């Protein structure tokens, strides 16, 4: 039986390096130790919240597995390895271990583009979209995302009685995902056990169709979490509202929507 003595978080760890880990200048926070280098990229609070291994407690392989799972959910973390080393015995003769949680940083930002063409019975069109992501916007592995999309399609044939001779769409969405359960008055232990993420988002969409012109505004507050070691996934929409406005429309269009 082994009890945990010191727990070190080693940021910017290089798996190919063979040098010994220098812990002489490690910082401390809530009885944990941090080897951060010159530019720490993630808050100490976030690291401690996702660690199930605690100083002074009995070694548990389940705590190790839960810690791996928790750090695997942090999108700014590319690589995690947990290493243990014997640390002798304390004054009561109890065997002790030191723990090293070795982390490597992933790329914080990404941009993706999409382009597509359409042909609907001879009516040609195209759509273009772009997505930007920052995986560590507040240095707690929060993911900020911004999406824009535009589409256009020409229309042919008899357009009498319609208000638009084309189909156009322009929309955007911004959101932030926190890798923890955010709600007032919750204990840290409960948040840690939930393995949940919290999503906030707002969106705006403008559409021109032959029968109407429509503007949609929306906002959402959602929770996502897993149970039974990730076998079950759950979604809960605490808030999901949409406001629809039709500045122009043909007669009778509302009855057909």
Positions of predicted regions on the chain:
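Transmembrane beta-barrel architecture of outer membranes
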Residues: 48, 66, 94-98, 110-112, ...
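Conserved structured core elements
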Residues: 41, 58-65, 74, 122-126, ...
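Transmembrane beta-strand segments that form the barrel wall of outer-membrane beta-barrel proteins
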Residues: 51, 84, 109-119, 128-130, ...
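Transmembrane beta-strand segments of outer-membrane beta-barrel domains in Gram-negative
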Residues: 35-42, 52, 110, 162-257
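Beta-strand elements of well-folded, non-transmembrane domains
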Residues: 11-13, 105-107, 117-119, 132-136, ...
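Amphipathic, soluble alpha/beta structural segments
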Residues: 58-73, 81-84, 88, 148-186
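Periplasmic polypeptide-binding modules associated with outer-membrane biogenesis and secretion
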Residues: 1-119, 149
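Secondary-structure transition/capping motifs at alpha-helix termini
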Residues: 73-78, 103-109, 134-143, 183-184, ...
């Amino acid at each position: 039986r082994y009890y945990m003595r010191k727990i070190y978080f080693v940021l910017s760890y290089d798996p190919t390096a063979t040098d010994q880990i220098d812990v002489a200048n490690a910082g401390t926070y809530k009885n944990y130790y941090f080897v951060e280098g010159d530019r720490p990229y993630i808050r100490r609070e976030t690291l401690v919240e996702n660690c199930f291994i605690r100083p002074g407690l009995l070694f548990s392989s389940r705590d190790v597995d839960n810690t791996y799972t928790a750090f695997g959910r942090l999108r700014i973390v590319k690589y995690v390895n947990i290493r243990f080393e014997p640390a002798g015995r304390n004054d009561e003769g109890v065997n002790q271990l030191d723990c090293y949680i070795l982390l490597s940083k992933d790329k914080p930002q990404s941009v993706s583009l999409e382009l597509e063409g359409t042909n609907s019975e001879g009516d040609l069109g195209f759509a273009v979209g772009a997505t930007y992501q920052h995986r560590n916007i507040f240095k707690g592995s929060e993911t900020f995302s911004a999406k824009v999309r535009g589409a256009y399609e020409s229309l042919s044939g008899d357009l009498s009685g319609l208000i638009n001779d084309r189909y156009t769409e322009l929309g955007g969405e911004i959101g932030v995902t926190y890798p923890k359960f955010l709600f007032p008055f919750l204990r840290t232990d409960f948040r840690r056990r939930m393995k949940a993420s919290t999503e906030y988002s707002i969106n705006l969409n403008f559409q021109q169709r032959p029968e109407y012109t429509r503007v949609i505004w929306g906002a959402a507050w959602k929770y996502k979490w897993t149970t039974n070691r990730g076998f079950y996934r759950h979604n809960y929409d605490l808030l999901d509202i949409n406001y629809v406005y039709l500045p122009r429309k043909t007669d009778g269009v509302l009855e057909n929507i």
